[in-house]
Amino acid sequence: MTDWHLKEDDVVVLQALDDMPEHLFRVREVYDDCITGYALTGPLKGVYGEPGLELILRVHSRSNGGDQGRG
């Protein structure tokens, strides 16, 4: 598993799952096995979630404007 070094307000890309397409997700809190936050795109836009870290495909943007697209 990748150590993403995620922080609050980072935006990640979550993989497609079942009927849910790949989408952007804003991180609020980071735990050992999941993140919390809100979907920014897709059918669940604005909805709170707690996706597992294994669902992260890549980092879309960093809250501090650094290293975009790298995990």
Which residues make up each language-model segment?
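Short linear motifs in intrinsically disordered
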Residues: 1-5, 26-29
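Short coil-to-beta transition motif at edge beta-strands of beta-rich domains
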Residues: 3-18
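Basic/aromatic-rich interaction segments and small domains that mediate binding to polyanionic partners
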Residues: 17-49
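Intrinsically disordered, low-complexity, charged/polar segments
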Residues: 39-71
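Ser/Thr- (and often Asn-) enriched beta-sheet segments in non-cytosolic proteins
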Residues: 10-13, 26-28, 36, 54-58
